[in-house]
Amino acid sequence: MWNKSSVDVAVSELKKESTASFPKPAVVKSIAPGSIGEELGFEPGDQLLKINGVRPRDLIDYRFLTVEEELHLEIMDSAGTIHYVDLEKEADDSLGLTFTEALFDGLRQCNNQCPFCFIDQQPPGHRDSLYLKDDDYRLSFLYGSYLTLTNLKDSDWKRIESQRLSPLYVSVHATQPELRAQLLHNSRAGLLMQQLDWFAQRNLQIHAQVVICPGLNDGKALDNTLQDLAIHAKGDWPVVLSTAIVPVGLTRFRPQNDGLIPIDTKCARQVIAQVELLQKKFKKTIGSNFAWLSDEWYLIAQKPLPARSAYEDLPQQENGVGSIRAFLENMDIATANLPSKIQKPKKCSWVVGRLVEKALIAASNKLNEVEGLTLHIFGLPSAYWGQDQVVTGLLTGADLIEGLKNKDLGEQLLLPSVMLKHGEDVFLDDMSLKELCETLQVPIRIVHGADDIVAAAIED
């Protein structure tokens, strides 16, 4: 939980700023069974207006405010009736509430114009949320999404300091000021190194990301970027905790003549050799590999993935760095005690992106050693995005229909959850899971990881 001194500072800051803006109420989505919220009578749809007289701007404010032991809540129910509730609790007791949104005062959108932005490489006509350019430091703190730091106001920097919002996840791309400003099409992007100094002076930390665009920020520029970041990775309290290097993703919808070059096998091998050489240097000077390549580099280069130990504690797993090794490790654990056979013969299918198919064949082969079980793995391209080699999370409903229609999928199709919008059964092209199921005429089971895949395969 938040320590007492931080809470005092944070609540003080909240009270100063509470009249400067007027966020929307926090709408309750669910209440944990047996929680204080349930005891108080909260219901989905109720609106939390104020906590101790302060209107929370977001989930971070809510967490800071509710750590107080004495709370005065102002709530409006679905009928529009206002309720005032006073309660006492322990500092570490949660109210047990979740909300429909994490931000009650709106999303901070990006003010850059990066030519490689994936949001700009989508077709028009889909749900609005697909076109929102998130560059919000609060979502970075809460969920690990990346931001550029170019749209922060003085009040934002003060809040980051007072509420100790650390670590944040920062899209760096380049540390050389002119180059970063060029890449982001924003003069404020050149302030990054001063901003890292600001974090250092306050003992705040970040994780970094570099999206490689061949001919722009690779080669010598990449060397400079990683070595500049590594300077801030030293000491007992490093500012930069880790750096992920990821390849630029290009789709068939991107603007013509954008000057961007796709990553090919030759480029991938050059970048791997370059970064692995720097890793050896960082291991000696920092005690960590510090900078890691996302799994796609090795798959594109047709090279073996590094050993699991090379990724240390997987600081960038959610960014696709070491995620395949982590999955295979979990699969080894999940398949350690497989039955020699299943009573009722079973045939099912598992669909993944073509880029990762070869890396996962060993996992499917191990399941196929169970007598009576047949698991077929389908690695699909994406005609939707115009990518032959695609990661699993970018496959759309249309891609699945095109790749799987009229195929023998067996009794069940195992579908990784990363293809669907979080919390909803809808793909990136707005096709619903129900529509896909009806078209393919096969039961579909959503799987979230190795344990789910093994359970789905061997269960009756």
Segments from the language model and where they lie:
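Radical SAM enzyme core and accessory elements
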Residues: 1-21, 27, 302-460
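Conserved Radical SAM active-site core
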Residues: 80-82, 89-238, 249-278
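Flexible glycine/acidic-rich beta-alpha junction loops that bind and position SAM and/or redox cofactors
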Residues: 216, 238-266, 286-309, 382-387
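A structural preference for short, hydrophobic beta-strand core positions in alpha/beta folds
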Residues: 208, 245, 293, 377-379, ...
